[in-house]
UniProtKB/Swiss-Prot annotation:
Its EC number is 7.3.2.1. It catalyses: phosphate(out) + ATP + H2O = ADP + 2 phosphate(in) + H(+). This is Phosphate import ATP-binding protein PstB 3. One of its GO terms (biological process) is phosphate ion transmembrane transport. The complex is composed of two ATP-binding proteins (PstB), two transmembrane proteins (PstC and PstA) and a solute-binding protein (PstS).
Length: 258
């Protein structure tokens, strides 16, 4: 029986971004594979974070940004003429940022914020279960179950990042975007987040920007290499790191530039 290729959860076609007339992304085509960790690598300023922000329209918040081309979620154009409500889109495509950014609220209220905003469950027992389940999925429940009323900002850096992941998954997104989620963390906290990412891909499609070649090789199944606003090469992570087809990719992963 022939194995069917993995279907894309999201796609980009001729996706371009200009900031005040300056090109940051130049007509990118890319499929985001469902049920995988899709890593985006490349030197600083190559467009990978700009691309990531296109996937849930975070670039809409930047006045000078102009986006053209197409990006789809399950075949629906998120920039189409009818438009997709950015708030609803961001519930389906969550985001975890480079530095942990818990709200100045309790641990409980950080996780409950999204479900309350979208009216997903009732307060009380239903919300309690959702908060607990989200914290368990983020590998944080046992560490905070007795201090849920404490401020999220009172946690360690690694715990704060896991709290932000719990907050993202509390609204049951289909895709989680991660913009260098470990860059501000120590090696122990980084290892825990990487383990968590591997667990989460059983439920969510993940797109992750990382500057760490080792991290991309460890946690992703598909890797796209960006350079100067374009995609140079995309493929299975093992192939990208062991037998890249493009000499520019080879130069980057071996440290000759970047």
């Amino acid at each position: 029986m022939t194995e069917q290729p993995a279907q894309p959860k999201m796609t980009a076609r001729s996706l371009a971004v200009h900031y005040g007339g300056k090109p940051a992304l130049k007509g990118v085509d890319l499929d985001i594979v469902a049920g995988e960790v899709n890593a985006l690598i490349g030197p600083s300023g190559c467009g990978k974070s700009t691309f990531l922000r296109c996937l849930n329209r975070m670039n809409d918040t930047i006045p000078a940004a102009k986006v053209s081309g197409q990006a789809t979620l399950d075949g629906e154009d998120i920039y189409g003429p009818a438009g997709m409500d950015p708030v609803l889109l961001r519930a389906r495509v969550g985001m975890v940022f480079q530095r942990p950014n818990p709200f100045p609220k309790s641990i409980y209220d950080n996780v409950a914020f999204g479900p309350r905003l979208h009216g997903l469950v009732a307060e009380g027992d239903e919300m309690d279960v959702l908060v607990r389940t989200s914290l368990e999925r983020a590998g944080l429940w046992k560490e905070v179950k007795d201090v849920l009323g404490n401020l999220g900002t009172s946690l360690s850096g690694g715990q704060q990042q896991r709290l932000c992941i719990a907050r993202a998954i509390a609204v049951s997104p289909e895709v989680i975007l991660m913009d260098e989620p470990c860059s501000a963390l120590d090696p122990i906290a980084t290892a825990r987040i990487e383990e968590l990412i591997d667990e989460l891909r059983d439920v969510f499609t993940i797109v992750m920007v990382t500057h760490s070649m080792q991290q991309a090789a460890r946690v992703s199944q598909t890797t796209a290499f960006f350079h100067l606003g374009e995609i140079v090469e995309v493929g299975a992570t093992e192939q990208i790191f062991t037998a890249p087809a493009n000499s520019l990719t080879q130069g980057y992963i071996t440290g000759r530039f970047g």
